[in-house]
């Protein structure tokens, strides 16, 4: 387990905790949101649950180094978990408890994970389900495996879609405006850090095209779509922001 900022791995709290199944999932799926949040002064910690061992291109060592560099570009800290390995992630309560331990340790307000849609890499859908379970387990004070940590209830769980096939059909998205040039530049640089995966720019161009499409839906130049696990609660109408429909 390594981090770009080891102080975040022990007891320091973070604002946002992001889980990804493989190196580059976070960068491609919600890297612009991470960049926007860290540039606004919020702390973000990334948890990568494999080193891309099953991938066609790049060694595990390369993949880990690329993710570490991308996290630095995004302004986030990072750690890697050894679970079942790339393409072997299983639905096991032990994994959910391990994720819950991270949630209790870092006490984030917001947690992001890959969507639970089945028509995508199986690690992605399973990770989304495991993180959802972990968010609940983290707030159960009587969990015998976690009695050494104080329970913690996150405020919101949001999903991101790495590919178009992973977009939930039954959840209305929230759109995060990522149009600021410095955000887009940092996000693009973080994706480009995964050199072993970028023999061409096709995948990066796909993500930029998706951001443009979401932006068109949101009435801005570029946007990232996130999908809330639960209804969002606002203290007043003034907090809701603007709607995507431009009446």
Locate predicted features.
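Metal-dependent de-N-acetylase/amidase catalytic core
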Residues: 2-17, 91-247
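Active-site rim/loop-helix segments in enzyme catalytic domains that contact anionic ligands
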Residues: 1-106, 227, 239-246
């Amino acid at each position: 387990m390594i981090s770009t900022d080891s102080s975040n791995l022990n007891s320091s709290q973070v604002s946002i905790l992001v889980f990804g199944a493989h190196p580059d999932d976070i960068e491609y799926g919600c890297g612009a949101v991470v960049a926007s949040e860290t540039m606004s002064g919020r702390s973000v910690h990334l948890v990568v649950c494999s080193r891309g061992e099953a991938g066609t291109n790049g060694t595990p060592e390369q993949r880990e180094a690329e993710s570490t560099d991308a996290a630095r570009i995004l302004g986030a800290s990072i750690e890697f978990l050894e679970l079942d390995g790339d393409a072997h992630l299983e639905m096991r309560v032990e994994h959910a408890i391990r994720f819950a331990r991270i949630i209790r340790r870092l006490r984030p307000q917001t947690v992001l994970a890959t969507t639970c849609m089945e028509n995508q890499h199986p690690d992605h859908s399973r990770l989304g389900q495991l993180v959802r379970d972990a968010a609940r387990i983290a707030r159960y004070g009587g969990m015998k495996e976690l009695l050494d940590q104080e329970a913690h209830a996150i405020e919101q769980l949001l999903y991101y879609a790495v590919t178009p096939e992973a977009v939930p059909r039954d959840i209305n998205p929230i759109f995060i405006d990522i149009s600021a040039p410095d955000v887009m530049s940092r996000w693009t640089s973080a994706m480009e850090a995964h050199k072993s995966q970028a023999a061409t720019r096709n995948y990066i161009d796909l993500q930029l095209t998706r951001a443009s499409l979401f932006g068109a839906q949101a009435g801005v130049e570029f946007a990232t779509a996130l999908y809330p696990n639960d209804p969002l609660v606002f203290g007043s109408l003034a907090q809701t922001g603007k709607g995507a429909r431009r009446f």
